[in-house]
From Swiss-Prot:
It is a single-pass type II membrane protein. Keywords: Disulfide bond, Epilepsy, Glycoprotein, Glycosyltransferase, Golgi apparatus, Intellectual disability, Lipid metabolism, Membrane, Signal-anchor, Transferase, Transmembrane, Transmembrane helix. Its EC number is 2.4.3.9. It comes from Homo sapiens (Human). The lineage of its organism: Eukaryota, Metazoa, Chordata, Craniata, Vertebrata. It comes from the Eukaryota. This is Lactosylceramide alpha-2,3-sialyltransferase.
Length: 418
């Protein structure tokens, strides 16, 4: 026996009628085409079906609310992270902090001049690094990414900044825009090159080493460390400005027409930013949202002056020399396995130059009230709030280089030799 609902589930077969009943007034005569019981004629659905439908309709609404909550949570954590990166406990009084003993200034200047007056030793830095770290240092490593590079297992194994896994097409696109990928010819022609890597340390202020620093063949400056207004202490010659997007100087005054801009690429949008800088294009607003601070809108240099740092140098610095653990997948942040730009630049210098000197390096965390940088009022205590770099391990590494005579410390922030 069929129920009424079941009867409504199918149409009755059409059967022609031989005799038509008289139609009431005002109604159409039924025909073989109207003698069908449609679904719309059936009774309303049962209460059980209606309840299920209401439940299904509520599910998407609940899902949207959950997604919104997660989005707001992530955004809130991101804001707190940005605030933490830019937070410092206090500012130092620069007038009081920058007094330097005149005798100390004279000794520092004399020592720096002695370093320059000695005969340059070809391949000294590479040879010394190879002896000190053996198989952990490669003497054949190229400093910059080449247009037709040798196959590198390390480069394809790691994500930025240690390699270019999944970014090979972006790298090739950038290299097509860059006509040169090595040191300029006038520097390559030198039989023996002296490098100085100038850090941002407050110890530089007052030493008046600017004139001496300008005499090095290759002067490497880091991030946005300024020259304008500080040339007496840090010089005004720049051969290489090495930085990542957020660290690049915002002022055109910090760029000279013959500088090399060496880009260190950490994340996907860094590739977009560098391409925009080379092509003199405006970076889209949505791309800017992925940087943790304001980035330069233009770099006033020609394409031939841009270089891309070989990421294997960062890999060599982090995993081989400093022996940090390899990167692990994390939901938020990074392990402390990313070296500072300064230490990466020191290793780069050993691949570029025959002799290497340092100035403006050294974090004395036992003196929290001393100036962190030569150009601002941040105190050394601010280093206690950074979470990306292992300052203790890096300090031991630099001290080892100075003690073994691989590099010279001109400002005495790592180990004073004067």
């Amino acid at each position: 026996m069929r129920t009424k609902a079941a009867g409504c589930a199918e149409r009755r077969p059409l059967q022609p009628r031989t005799e038509a009943a008289a139609a009431p007034a005002g109604r159409a005569m039924p025909s073989e085409y109207t003698y069908v019981k449609l679904r719309s004629d059936c009774s309303r659905p049962s209460l059980q079906w209606y309840t299920r439908a209401q439940s299904k309709m509520r599910r998407p609404s609940l899902l949207l609310k959950d997604i919104l909550k997660c989005t707001l949570l992530v955004f809130g954590v991101w804001i707190l992270y940005i605030l933490k990166l830019n937070y410092t406990t206090e500012e130092c009084d620069m007038k009081k902090m920058h007094y330097v003993d005149p005798d100390h200034v004279k000794r520092a200047q004399k020592y720096a001049q002695q370093v320059l007056q000695k005969e340059c030793r070809p391949k000294f830095a590479k040879t010394s690094m190879a002896l000190l770290f053996e198989h952990r240092y490669s003497v054949d490593l190229l400093p910059f990414v080449q247009k037709a590079p040798k196959d590198s297992e390390a480069e394809s194994k790691y994500d930025p900044p240690f390699g270019f896994r999944k970014f090979s097409s972006k790298v090739q696109t950038l290299l097509e825009l860059l006509p040169e990928h090595d040191l300029p010819e006038h520097l390559k022609a030198k039989t023996c090159r002296r490098c100085v890597v100038i850090g941002s340390g407050g110890i530089l202020h007052g030493l008046e080493l600017g004139h001496t620093l300008n005499q090095f063949d290759v002067v490497i400056r880091l991030n946005s460390a300024p020259v304008e207004g500080y040339s007496e202490h840090v010089g005004n010659k720049t051969t290489i400005r090495m930085t990542y997007p957020e660290g690049a100087p915002l002022s055109d005054l910090e760029y000279y027409s013959n500088d090399l801009f060496v880009a260190v690429l950490f994340k996907s949008v860094d590739f977009n930013w560098l391409q925009a800088m080379v092509k003199k294009e405006t970076l889209p607003f949505w791309v800017r949202l992925f940087f943790w601070k304001q980035v330069a809108e233009k770099i006033p240099l020609q394409p031939k002056h841009f270089r891309i740092l070989n990421p294997v140098i960062i890999k060599e610095t982090a995993f081989d020399i400093l022996q940090y653990s390899e990167p692990q997948s994390r939901f938020w942040g990074r392990d402390k396995n990313v070296p500072t730009i300064g230490v990466i630049a020191v290793v780069l210098a050993t691949h570029l130059c025959d002799e290497v000197s340092l100035a403006g390096f050294g974090y004395d965390l036992n003196q929290p009230r001393t100036p962190l940088h030569y150009f601002d009022s941040q105190c050394m205590a601010a280093m206690n709030f950074q979470t990306m770099h292992n300052v203790t391990t890096e300090t031991k590494f630099l001290l080892k280089l100075v003690k073994e005579g691989v590099v010279k410390d001109l400002s005495g922030g790592i180990d004073r030799e004067f």
